[in-house]
Swiss-Prot record:
PTM info: Autophosphorylated.
InterPro entries hit by this protein: HATPase_C_sf, His_kinase_dom, HisK_dim/P_dom, HisK_dim/P_sf, PAS-like_dom_sf, Sensor_HK_Regulatory, Sig_transdc_His_kin-like_C
Example of a GO cellular component annotation carried by this entry: plasma membrane
Cysteine pairings via disulfide bonds: none
Catalyzed chemical reaction(s): ATP + protein L-histidine = ADP + protein N-phospho-L-histidine
Lineage: Bacteria, Pseudomonadati, Pseudomonadota, Alphaproteobacteria, Caulobacterales
Bilayer topology term: Single-pass membrane protein
Location in or out of the cell: Cell membrane
Molecular function terms, GO-annotated: ATP binding; phosphorelay sensor kinase activity
Organism: Caulobacter vibrioides (strain ATCC 19089 / CIP 103742 / CB 15) (Caulobacter crescentus)
Protein name per UniProt: Sensor protein DivL
Length: 769
């Protein structure tokens, strides 16, 4: 019997004792109620309590009958006086009942429930001068109270009220049932669980905690023996596990105690699932796993174990001992061959006594396989063994060594000068390029033998002794930092630039390679000089463009300003006003072209940064339409916007996207004759937003379409032709691209493909890598 069972049995015994006392008290109360009814009948026949026999007042227990709000003393005058003294009240029935109600709100609620609804109650009332045991029952139209003072000397002894309170304090359901399984009394937890009005038999009629529990009660009553069972029951909407104990009681009935073991069962279930998952995991690994218990019997094995050794599952299911497994494997020649098998087996089984880490073994089996055996003590006792077939691994290792030899032979054919030195400094390998590079003969290298001798042969071409000392440290020093890969360049006495590399090899050797990179470095130097010259030229060009552009903007600003003043001036003719407007328009166009040149120069220099924000696409199109509407009206062209409702927002630089649309709209208006139509539209598809500017103009010739986005492509009307090139550059800054669809005579459509989300400075690579 486990400790849990002992605790459960002790608790069940205590509860059964309490239930037995409560049952005895219940019988006593029933007998007393019958006596009180008879006494009240005699009292009424005698004409009132004043004529009652004197012996009625001799009881220590006061019996009070309550009907219609009136309380009458039936018996126990001395008991009433003692109770009144304990409660600090007058020795009158009404005063005592009132004192009970005033002593505690809970007492008042219980008495009200008794007088109004006939609900029984049992409690101990504490007054200023003592304790009073109170028991209330309803019989017919009367409510009866039995009051008894509790002597201070007996205040710690168990009473019926205290036993009832003790049983009610138990959080698990407890009840007394008849032989048919029907509950006849229950504690507060049981009453709540079954939804009964009270703990008395009439209120419990038809109530059941669990049908399976009732069956256990019937079985215990029928056999007169204690019965236990585990039941899963829904309590207050939650599924709980209860350990049910049904104990037949002397005098009839069965006491039932329930212990809530939900957490224990949950832990048990979780542990079971954990073990199953652990076993399932081991069953899916390639290694053979076996677990032997403390008694050296096989407690677990995975599928790979049975397959590795060719053992029958039925035989393994009988849980053979470790020794029996070894004997069967030896009979089938599946263990390493040994002269003293008995000693080998004894040493193998003696490992159970060694609780520390154990070294791994390699078993060479007669069939040519090699097994790696790993042993470790199991946390629950016994031993865990893992068998791994490493035959293929050893075969691969041999193949790998052969491959290394082939690779070393391959190094001998390289153009670079290669030499391999062992950890002892001896020259192990060199190629012909090494002999040529240092102008030494094979015989001289063979005679040199070690690193120091080789250095003496190479010093005439490389005089830097500090270089050779450092290289020697790479070869002979076992410090991991010194054996780290290194590379660098040195210059020989004949002015060659030599690239050297040092690489440690797995066997402790060191590979040193030398390459003549003189021509490469000369070419790199020439390219660097040319690149610097080009960068300087680009800088000068950018500075020149910037200076010229800023120099032009000053007079243009003056021209535009005075043109606007002249347009608004009085006394100027209409023809003169038109001329002034033309001057202002030309100056504005020139200023815009200068801005385009500056923007393009800034983009070329990689200095343009985007100010990313949320932009409503519909607002972007409508604003572009508003800016170009006047020019469209002057040219007799219809400018329309078509935007789908679900396009929504886009992440980008609002100023630069507006500049892009302005250039596209300007180009479309320029290509569209009077009466034509230019349409701005947007749609969302395939994770991008597409902005279209289409026109019904004359279209773009096929031979021009391939170069339409190049810089300074000529236009029908003057200008540097940077508009479309700037459009392409700005869209690419947003991580997008621009496409053209055009057929000569049928108009053109420029489409800007923009990603839905954009990071500042993003740009699509030109080659799409």
């Amino acid at each position: 019997m486990t400790s849990y069972d002992l605790i459960l049995a002790a608790a069940a015994g205590a509860v059964c004792l309490a239930i037995s006392v409560a049952l005895w008290s219940h019988g006593q109360r029933r007998n007393l109620e019958a006596r009180i009814v008879a006494l009240k009948t005699r009292l009424i026949q005698q004409g009132g309590s004043d004529d009652a026999p004197a012996w009625l007042d001799a009881f220590d227990t006061a019996v009070i009958a309550v009907e219609g709000g009136r309380a009458n003393l039936v018996a126990g005058g001395e008991g009433l006086i003692a109770c009144a003294k304990a409660l600090g009240a007058d020795a009158e029935v009404s005063a005592v009942v009132a004192a009970l109600s005033d002593a505690d709100p809970n007492y008042a609620q219980k008495l009200t429930a008794l007088f109004e609804r006939g609900e029984p109650c049992v409690f101990e009332a504490r007054g200023p001068h003592g304790l009073v045991s109170v028991e209330g029952r309803a019989a017919g139209a009367l409510a009866w109270l039995r009051l008894a003072p509790i002597d201070r000397a007996d205040s710690g002894l168990p009473t019926a009220a205290r036993f009832a309170a003790f049983v009610d304090s138990v959080v698990e359901p407890c009840w007394i049932a008849g032989a048919d399984g029907q509950a006849i009394w229950g504690n507060a937890a049981f009453v709540r669980a079954v939804g009964a009005a009270s703990a008395q038999a009439p209120a419990l009629a038809g109530k059941s905690f669990d049908r399976g529990a009732d069956a256990v009660v019937v079985e215990a009553a029928g056999k007169g023996e204690r019965r236990e069972a585990l039941r899963w029951i829904n309590v207050e909407g939650r599924r709980r596990a209860f350990r049910l104990s049904a104990q037949p009681l002397d005098g009839g009935g069965v006491g039932v105690f329930c212990a809530d073991v939900t957490e224990i069962e949950d832990v048990r279930d979780a542990f079971k699932k954990h073990v199953e998952a652990h076993d399932e995991t081991l069953n899916h690994i390639a290694e053979a796993v076996a677990i032997f218990s403390q008694t050296r019997r096989l407690s677990y094995h995975n599928t790979a174990f049975a397959e590795l050794w060719g053992l029958e599952p039925a035989w393994l299911a009988d849980r053979p001992t470790h020794g029996e497994v070894l004997d069967r494997l030896r009979q089938r020649r599946r263990l390493p061959e040994t002269i003293d098998y008995a000693g080998w087996k004894a040493a193998e089984l003696a490992r159970y006594e060694d609780l520390g880490p154990q070294a791994d073994d390699l078993w060479d089996l007669p069939d040519g396989r090699t097994l790696k055996v790993v042993r470790q003590p199991h946390p629950l006792g016994g031993m865990l063994l893992i068998y791994s077939d490493i035959t293929g691994e050893l075969r691969l290792k041999a193949q790998y060594n052969a491959l290394i030899q082939v690779q070393q032979a391959t190094l001998d054919k390289l153009n670079d000068a290669v030499a391999v030195f062992g950890s002892d400094g001896r020259l192990r390998l060199h190629n012909e390029a090494f002999e040529t590079f240092w102008n030494v003969t094979p015989h001289a290298l063979e005679a040199a033998g070690d690193f120091e001798g080789v250095v003496e042969l190479c010093v005439p071409r490389l005089h830097d002794l500090s270089f050779w000392r450092e290289l020697k440290g790479r070869v002979a020093d076992p410090d991991p930092q010194m054996r780290a890969p290194t590379s660098g360049e040195v210059r020989t006495s004949d002015s060659r630039i030599v690239l050297y590399q040092s690489r440690p090899l797995p066997d402790g050797a060191t590979l040193i390679a030398f390459a003549d990179v003189t021509d490469t470095r000369d070419l790199q130097s020439a390219l660097a000089d040319r690149s610097a010259a080009l960068a300087e030229a680009e800088r000068l060009k950018r500075d020149f463009v910037g200076n010229v552009s800023y120099e032009l903007r000053t007079p243009l600003t003056t021209i535009i300003g005075y043109s606007e003043l002249l347009e608004r001036a009085d006394g100027i003719s209409e023809r003169g006003r038109n001329h002034v407007a033309a001057v202002r328009a030309a100056a504005t166009q020139l200023a815009r072209s200068i801005d385009d040149v500056l923007d393009m120069a800034q983009i070329d220099a990689g200095e343009m940064a985007l100010e990313i924000e949320d932009i409503r696409v519909s607002d972007l199109l409508l604003n572009a339409q508003e800016r170009a509407l006047k020019d469209a009206q002057l040219g007799g062209v219809t400018l329309a916007v078509e935007c789908e409702e679900d396009v929504g927002l886009i992440r980008g630089d609002g100023k630069r996207l507006a500049q892009t649309l302005d250039h596209l709209v300007e180009n479309a208006l320029r290509q569209t004759p009077p009466g034509g139509r230019v349409t701005l539209s947007a749609r969302r598809a395939l994770g991008e937003v597409r902005l279209d500017v289409s026109d019904t103009g004359r279209g773009v010739p096929f031979h021009v379409q391939a170069h339409i986005f190049d810089r300074f492509v000529g236009r029908d009307r003057g200008g540097p032709g940077l508009g479309l090139a700037l459009v392409k550059a700005l869209v690419e800054l947003h991580g997008g691209w621009v496409a053209l669809e055009s057929e000569p005579g049928n108009g053109s459509t420029f489409t800007c493909h923009l990603p839905e989300t954009q990071q500042p400075g993003a740009m699509q690579p030109e080659l799409g890598f």
